[in-house]
Amino acid sequence: MKGTVFALGLLCVSATLTSCFKDEPLNAECDIEQAYIHVDNPEAMFFNNNDTLVKVLSSERNIKFKVLPEADITAVVPQFRVTPGATVAAVDGLPLNTPRDFSDGKTVQYTVTSEDGQWNRTYTVSMGMRTLDAISNFGFENVQMVTEGCNRPYDAWVESFDDGYIIDCWATGNGGFDISMGVEDDENHVTKDQFPSVSVDNGRTGKAVRLTTCDTGPFGHLMNMPIAAGNLFLGKFDLSEALGETLKATMFGVPVSKKPLNLSGYYKYKPGETFTNRDNKIDPTITDRGDIYAVLYRNTNEKGQAVTLDGGNVRTSNLIVATAIIDEVKTTDEWTFFNIPFTYTANIDPTTLARHGYNLAVVFTSSFKGADFQGAVGSTLYIDDVNLSWEE
């Protein structure tokens, strides 16, 4: 009975995380679900037509449109699809149909207010595009704390340029683990350092990433998700799918405009003692192991529709054109070098590449079957000093 009550309580908590939900007669949701721009000639402004629309995840507060470097963005009118009954207004008080100047990194803030008037969220809209291929070395020194829309704070990683420009390119499943562990004052309370994906100071150089397979507590067991592997990947994590179609929650890949040639870096790894399957049954025939791999894929299908690979197809999609997969993550207490060349299975269209028509996913995980909620609690993978080499 206690477990059932706990699970029902957590379901309520998860709803609040995704959309400001509250049991009121009028709708209490206050989200921007989509942002879009209508222009007569999208090819002159965007890399491809799909870039005219941005899907906004429930955890996001920054909305960035990907535009060509030469695009005129001095008089643009963003438009929004919001949750039913909600209203949106510019923070500066100007009408929504006012053309805005987004040149030179300028931003505009908009506030969404729920139908019941009790809740609001502020979003920042910007335009521009700097791709990941402008960076080669990833030391994971830039750590931010997620504090909004969660039960407890947890780590997240970003990359920054010399001028301070930030690329929010790395994602983890920490948000899903946060849901499974309930609110801060319950019996399953965990601290930031007990999350699956954590920043640590004892890196090979400076900080490192520690990925640990963790027990998800009574709620996770009830949902047939008994473990959460520590993971770090290029892409986004969709909290709205964390308790539903879980494989779709991991949205793998970010746009690139150069061909990746090699993925290298350093790791340490130790498997947990006991491997359990999704039913939380011990499987003595399997020793857990970590995984490191990268996938380059076309981000539009044959119909021209935008595609993002997820946990269900990131290794199998026919849109994949290159992979870099480690042969083995060995058990070791020492920082161990890995160097994985990309193997190309299809020709790269240089025009498509230049217009950001390919996405790159790089994935690190403490349990090789973590996407299916199988693994050994305590399996730990440390990652540091990762390098991506690009074709110039």
Q: Model segments located where?
A:
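Bacterial Sec-dependent N-terminal signal peptides
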Residues: 1-31
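Beta-rich interaction/scaffold domains
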Residues: 20-138
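Residues within well-ordered beta-strands of beta-sheet-rich folds
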Residues: 111, 139, 262-268, 293-295, ...
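Extracellular carbohydrate-recognition regions
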Residues: 129-186
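Short carbohydrate-recognition loop motifs
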Residues: 200-219
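Extracellular-facing segments of soluble proteins and assemblies that are Gly/Ser/Thr-biased and enriched
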Residues: 215-302
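Extracellular carbohydrate recognition and processing domains
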Residues: 301-354, 376
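Extracellular carbohydrate recognition
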Residues: 352-357, 367-390
